[in-house]
């Protein structure tokens, strides 16, 4: 009887431990963080601490499943070439604003995005970067299209 209990216990615990290990490895990876300055006519408007997403895997995951994103923080999506960009909010549970940024750091568009929305938000022209922040942050700190993003 005792050996049956041990066998049943082992059959239960081993899969449970494997599931726990898998889930914990799926939690938010820490990406490199850089401080970005946003300027207008040489004057500092705001700074944001942005996680830098460069690999395809990092960009695909983005801010999915995050429960919060503090004010003044965000994620910068970096691409090798200029392109029309489209983002959607599948599995993203926090409202975000996105700035589409040209190769030289100029903000081309700022748009709001809504949780779990499958509709794409698209840049109006080819850009090199996209910066996601908490929804309304750009407006709240006075950032506008035409402002310059500088990566420190």
Residue map of PLM features:
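Bacterial N-terminal signal peptides that target proteins for export
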Residues: 2-14
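Bacterial N-terminal signal peptides
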Residues: 13-24
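A general, composition-driven signal for non-globular sequence regions
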Residues: 5, 23-24, 53
């Amino acid at each position: 009887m005792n050996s049956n209990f041990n066998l049943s216990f082992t059959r239960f615990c081993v899969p449970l431990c494997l599931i726990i290990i898998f889930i914990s490895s799926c939690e938010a990876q820490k990406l490199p963080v850089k401080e970005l300055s946003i300027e207008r006519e040489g004057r500092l408007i705001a700074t944001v601490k942005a996680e830098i997403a460069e690999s395809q895997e990092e960009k695909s995951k983005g801010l999915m499943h995050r429960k919060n994103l503090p004010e003044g923080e965000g994620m910068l999506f970096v691409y090798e070439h200029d392109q029309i960009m489209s983002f959607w909010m599948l599995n993203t549970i926090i409202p975000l604003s996105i700035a589409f940024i040209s190769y030289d750091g100029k903000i081309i568009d700022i748009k709001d995005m809504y949780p779990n929305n499958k509709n794409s938000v698209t840049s109006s022209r080819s850009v090199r970067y996209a910066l996601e922040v908490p929804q309304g942050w750009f407006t709240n700190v006075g950032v506008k299209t035409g402002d310059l993003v500088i990566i420190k």
